[in-house]
């Protein structure tokens, strides 16, 4: 399950400037979609709840990303392996403390890493799921 800012009922804090809103929307709904063809509406949001069997079905050695792109890579791999991604609307509130880590360098790195994710996982299919240890014991 993914908490999404970009499904019906989802929203962003009114304190976000239009530039930040546009960058986030464009990254999720245009750029990532064009490269990965991911059906997930909010690939970069951090509100996630994972089913144990989905996590066990992903070969974690394949996941190379960290930071913002980690969220997109996990959503993409989940979709490529044929698992369902369920999105629920969330309100994304402005932080009360601290500073954003989203520098220009991080934006460029994230944009380039989307291509790496596409290249690394484009051939994944449901048959590539790992057999969960918990299910191996039951058989």
What are these regions (language model features)?
Residues 1, 54, 85-90, 114:
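Hydrophobic aliphatic residue packing
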Residues 46, 74-75:
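Short, hydrophobic alpha-helical packing/hinge segments within bilobed ligand-binding/sensory domains
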Residues 29, 77, 110-114:
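Generic recognition of well-ordered alpha-helical segments
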Residues 18, 23, 65, 85-87, ...:
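Hydrophobic alpha-helical segments
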Residues 53-54, 80-82, 112-139:
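Terminal low-complexity segments of carbohydrate-biosynthetic enzymes
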Residues 38-39, 62-66, 75-93:
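Catalytic donor-sugar/metal-binding loop of nucleotide-sugar-dependent glycosyltransferases
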């Amino acid at each position: 399950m993914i908490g999404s800012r970009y499904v019906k009922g989802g929203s962003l804090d009114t304190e976000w400037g239009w530039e930040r809103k546009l960058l986030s929307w464009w990254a999720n709904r245009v750029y990532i979609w064009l490269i990965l063809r991911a059906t997930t509406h909010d690939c970069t949001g951090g509100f996630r709840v994972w089913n144990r069997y989905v996590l066990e079905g992903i070969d974690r050695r394949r996941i190379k990303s960290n930071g913002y792109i980690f969220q997109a890579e996990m959503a993409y791999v989940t979709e490529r392996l044929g698992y369902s991604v369920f999105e629920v609307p969330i309100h994304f509130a402005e932080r009360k403390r601290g500073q954003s880590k989203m520098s220009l360098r991080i934006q460029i790195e994230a944009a380039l890493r989307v291509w790496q994710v596409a290249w690394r996982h484009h051939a994944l299919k449901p048959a590539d799921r790992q057999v969960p240890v918990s299910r191996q014991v039951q058989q």
